[in-house]
Amino acid sequence: MMFTKLFQQWSFAVFLLSYSVPSYGRSVEGISRRLKRAVSEHQLLHDKGKSIQDLRRRIFLQNLIEGVNTAEIRATSEVSPNPKPATNTKNYPVRFGSEDEGRYLTQETNKSQTYKEQPLKVSGKKKKAKPGKRKEQEKKKRRARSAWLNSGMYGSNVTESPVLDNSVTTHNHILR
């Protein structure tokens, strides 16, 4: 008796959970379809997540750099056994970007602001390379190869493979 009553309650609970009940005249499936996002909304959320991740990475790297540069300076009057010569280095300030970069989504920002430090390209014709120098070297190599293959010297040499025989090609380069 107790078992049948418990079984009925459980089966009724399973029935209610598995059956989609209409709400305000629409089925539950219709409501869930309304929650699907548009492509632009997905892109917006993706860009927002990416900018947040970039901001976190920037903060993390800044904290790392601050931790590296806080070493104590030891005041020693001793001369080190192997003194190193002073290197010609310049100390540039470390900067990872503007402070307001993380506030805006990438679609909202002006892309040209990110690349301020790059020099502007001068529009005009490209300078042509001097004709002849590289091409002449290629021509010489081709002539040497064709002369070497046509002469038949590679068959009488110690090595049987013309690819591995460097002595003949070196000889031809010296002759030309």
Swiss-Prot record:
Residues 26-37 form a propeptide. Residues 58-69 are annotated as: Important for receptor binding. GO terms for biological process: adenylate cyclase-activating G protein-coupled receptor signaling pathway; bone mineralization; negative regulation of chondrocyte hypertrophy; osteoblast development; regulation of chondrocyte differentiation; regulation of growth plate cartilage chondrocyte differentiation; regulation of growth plate cartilage chondrocyte proliferation. The keyword Cytoplasm applies. Residues 1-25 form the signal peptide. A motif (Nuclear localization signal) lies at residues 109-130. Residues 76-157 are annotated as: Disordered. GO terms for molecular function: hormone activity; peptide hormone receptor binding. Keywords: Calcium, Cleavage on pair of basic residues, Cytoplasm, Hormone, Nucleus, Secreted, Signal. Residues 123-133 have a biased composition (Basic residues). Residues 77-91, 106-116 have a biased composition (Polar residues). Disulfide bonds: none annotated. It is found in: Secreted; Cytoplasm; Nucleus. Pfam families: Parathyroid. GO terms for cellular component: cytoplasm; extracellular region; nucleus. Neuroendocrine peptide which is a critical regulator of cellular and organ growth, development, migration, differentiation and survival and of epithelial calcium ion transport. Acts by binding to its receptor, PTH1R, activating G protein-coupled receptor signaling. Regulates endochondral bone development and epithelial-mesenchymal interactions during the formation of the mammary glands and teeth. Required for skeletal homeostasis. Belongs to the parathyroid hormone family. This is Parathyroid hormone-related protein.
